[in-house]
Amino acid sequence: MAELATIARPYAEALFKASGSDLGAAAAWLDELAAIAANVQLQQFAGNPGVTVTQTFDVISGVAKSQLPDAAKNFLRTVIENGRISVLPEIAAQFRVLKNAQSGSSDATVYSAFPLEGPALADLAATLEKRFGRKLNFAVELEPALIGGVRVVVGDEVLDTSVKARLEQMKVALIS
């Protein structure tokens, strides 16, 4: 894992510097490319010695949902030419860290037993931003095993207010 981070860091830093004031757009297309590159079949295709850089580029850009800007195309070609397709997800993660550091925000993943939308999500967001003391970029994922409540992951901090966590605490207390 540390090796991937070491390989990805220069790419993420170069893209961060080159993106300038357009960090949001760069993050969007980089996340899309990272999701595509995470596909095992694509990695096998790209790793095939009989497949050219152009063929790999055409497949990835063809799968992309949106039209890639020139900066994205150039970045993708560079990554493919250097044989770093498998590192794209880590590049995207490190780019987000740099982007968040500049804006003073953090990524937060909210795991919930039930869908969170509208006012409920806005209330939760306001409460969590107050709790963590910074602006949070939310991603909500359903996890029915929580039974109720939410589990929030912000960097290396976890706030677990789920029913499942409370039941586990009660179990530990009763067994002790």
UniProtKB/Swiss-Prot annotation:
Family affiliation: Belongs to the ATPase delta chain family.
Species lineage: Bacteria, Pseudomonadati, Pseudomonadota, Betaproteobacteria, Burkholderiales
Keyword Nucleus belongs to the record: no
Gene field: atpH
Subunit structure: F-type ATPases have 2 components, F(1) - the catalytic core - and F(0) - the membrane proton channel. F(1) has five subunits: alpha(3), beta(3), gamma(1), delta(1), epsilon(1). F(0) has three main subunits: a(1), b(2) and c(10-14). The alpha and beta chains form an alternating ring which encloses part of the gamma chain. F(1) is attached to F(0) by a central stalk formed by the gamma and epsilon chains, while a peripheral stalk is formed by the delta and b chains.
GO function term, MF aspect, one: proton-transporting ATP synthase activity, rotational mechanism
Key words, A-Z: ATP synthesis, Cell inner membrane, Cell membrane, CF(1), Hydrogen ion transport, Ion transport, Membrane, Transport
Membrane topology: Peripheral membrane protein
Cellular location(s): Cell inner membrane
Protein name: ATP synthase subunit delta
Keyword Membrane: yes
Function (record text): F(1)F(0) ATP synthase produces ATP from ADP in the presence of a proton or sodium gradient. F-type ATPases consist of two structural domains, F(1) containing the extramembraneous catalytic core and F(0) containing the membrane proton channel, linked together by a central stalk and a peripheral stalk. During catalysis, ATP synthesis in the catalytic domain of F(1) is coupled via a rotary mechanism of the central stalk subunits to proton translocation.
Record-level GO cellular component terms: plasma membrane; proton-transporting ATP synthase complex
Domain of life of the source: Bacteria
Organism: Polaromonas sp. (strain JS666 / ATCC BAA-500)
Annotated HAMAP family: ATP_synth_delta_bact (MF_01416)
